[in-house]
Structures are given as C-alpha cells and as structure tokens.
Design a protein with these regions (language model features):
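Conserved, mostly hydrophobic/aromatic
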Residues: 38, 67, 166, 194, ...
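Active-site phosphate/pyrophosphate- and oxyanion-stabilizing loops and adjacent acidic/basic residues
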Residues: 39-40, 130, 260, 285
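Core AdoMet radical
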Residues: 58, 75-93, 98-191, 200-204, ...
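Flexible, acidic/Gly-rich N-terminal and inter-domain linker regions that tether
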Residues: 1-65
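Short functional micro-motifs and their immediate structural scaffolds
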Residues: 68, 72-75
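Conserved strand-turn element in the central/C-terminal portion of the radical SAM core barrel
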Residues: 106, 113-116, 190-214, 233-248, ...
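Catalytic cores of alpha/beta
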Residues: 148-158, 209-222, 278-290
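Auxiliary Fe-S-binding modules of radical SAM enzymes
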Residues: 1-29, 224-299
Length: 299
C-alpha cells in the first residue's frame, strides 16, 4: 500500500484502512512497520517542513451549542471564563508575540454557533484581522468562528484571512452522540462555503468522544473528499461538568495507529498535533514518525 501511494498516488479504500486498524495495539513489531511506512509517505509528499500555528480564545463562554465535550457551552456548568470579543490591540499583541516565537499562522477563535445574523461581531472581526495584517510581517491569518455563510466568509477573506478552521469532530454516524443543536451537514456546508470563496480549510476532530476507530476512519475519508489541507488531531481532555467528563481515554498506541492510517488516507495533508496531545505521554514524540508534520503551539 505504501509503495502504491508513493509511486501511483493511490487512494486507499475504507476496507484497506480498516484492515490497517486491525493491527493489535500490543503488536509493537507490526505497529512500528506501520509507523515507518506512514513516515515514508509523509517524507515523499511533504518533505521535512514542519508547520506551526497558534490561536487565541478571542471570545469565551455562553455558547448556545450543546457539544458534549466543550467547556464553553452554556448548557453545562464548567466554570469556563466568560468574556466578549477582545480588542484589536490585544489581538495584535498576541499575534506579534506568537510571530516572534516562530508561529507561521495565527487564528482568532470565538465561542458561539457562528457569525450568521451577527453582523456587528463580523464587522469587528474584519476590523481586527485587517489591523493584524497591517502590523505583522509574514504571519498568515486563520479564523475559527463556527457556522458561516459564503457572504460572511467572503468578508473574512477580504480582510486578509487565508484559512478557515471548522472541525467535523467525528464521523457522520457518531456525530449525533456529540451534538444535537446543529448537524454534521451544517459543518460540511460551512466547509464548502469557505472553499467556495477561495479559503483554505483546516478541519479535523477529537479522539476519545466514545467513537470507534471505524468512525475515525470515516471522518478521515470525508476530510479527504473535502480536500482539506490541514487536519488537526485533538485528544479529548475531559472537562468536569460536561457529559463527557468520565469518558474512557483512548490508548496512546491506538491514537498513533490512527494517525498513521490518516497519513495513508491523506498523504499530502498537514496532519497537525492539536489539543490534548499531552495525553500521549511518553509516546508524543513517536507521533512525529507516524505522519505528524505540523502542530498547534502555545498553552
């Protein structure tokens, strides 16, 4: 499979991905062969470049949505910080600090369902992105503001945003177990809207929501079909007060196995270490030879 992917740009099937997933988590000899193959695919398609991005929580708490993993949902009592949109001066200060520390990309992330019907917030965000763009160097701007129309996304693009972030979070099958206040198709449509106005899209998910490895594979196949350029891989950090606070953690070696399979499925994509990677413990460095070639930095 590795050779077919490298030499023929072969797209592996769901059945082939599931076959790889059946390697036992305690079979280190075979897992190491899988990890090395994923690393060779990464090297062939992506080279040695490692991309760094960073985000700030630009508006926090009181989210109307009921995503069961999220501290910022108004449906759960988590003690999360609550504040409105940050000032352009504070956003610029954070952008410059992160640029000086080596980040290639910088994003504002805001709580809430999205920007649809919220022209006041959209206009403020446009002002902030323009301000950051005017006062930084080569820092690329990304945005993460939930469900959006083409019109709102076009305004963000015109303000200098290059990439829009909107996770699928899990598979279509499992998504109703994660959130019921919006649908999987709402997320798909936002991704399509972003691509329609010329934005690159960053979209991935969270491991440990209660999904199966087949769900993770199905999400990856959807991401491939959507031609996503950056896939953040997050590991659930259970938040007290949320419905998922007692979720059983995914074994670190299963996470690494899944990352390797993602590299087989998406050979040219940035596979990005996101939140919760500390859950991998001593195995976190191994991810760098399983296909990871980018990371979200910061606290």
């Amino acid at each position: 499979l590795k050779n077919k992917i490298i030499n023929e740009k072969y797209e592996i099937t769901r059945e082939e991905a599931i076959f790889l997933s059946q390697i036992p988590n305690n079979d280190m000899e075979t897992l190491n062969i899988l990890f090395d193959a994923a690393d060779q695919i990464r090297e062939a398609f992506c080279g040695k470049y490692f991309d760094l991005c960073t985000i700030i929580n630009a508006k926090s708490g009181k989210c109307s949505e009921n995503c069961k993993y999220c501290a910022q949902s108004a449906h759960f009592k988590t003690g999360a910080d609550v504040y409105g949109l940050v000032s352009k001066e504070l956003a610029l200060c954070e952008a410059k600090r992160n640029e000086n520390e080596g980040a290639h990309r910088f994003s504002l992330v805001t709580s809430g369902r999205g920007l649809n019907g919220n022209e006041k917030e959209l206009d403020k965000l446009v002002e902030i992105y323009k301000y950051i763009g005017e006062h930084t160097g080569k820092l690329e701007l990304c945005a993460s503001h939930g469900i959006c129309t083409k019109e709102a996304l076009q305004k963000l693009a015109d303000a200098g945003v290059l990439t829009y972030h909107h996770n699928l979070e899990s598979s279509r099958r499992f998504y109703p177990n994660v959130c019921t206040s919006h649908t999987y198709d709402d997320r798909i449509n936002t991704i399509k809207n972003a691509k329609a106005v010329g934005l690159d899209v960053c979209s991935g998910g969270i491991f440990g929501l209660g999904e199966t490895i087949e769900d993770r594979i199905d999400m990856a196949l959807d991401l491939r079909a959507l031609e996503i350029c950056s896939v953040p891989i997050n590991v659930l950090t259970p938040i007290p007060g949320t419905p998922f606070e007692n979720n059983v953690p995914v074994e670190p070696l299963e996470i690494l196995k899944t990352i390797s399979i993602y590299r087989f499925i998406m050979p040219e994509t940035y596979l990005r270490y996101g939140g919760g990677r500390i859950k991998l413990g001593e195995h976190v460095k191994t991810g760098l030879r399983c296909g990871i070639n980018s990371a979200l930095t910061g606290n």
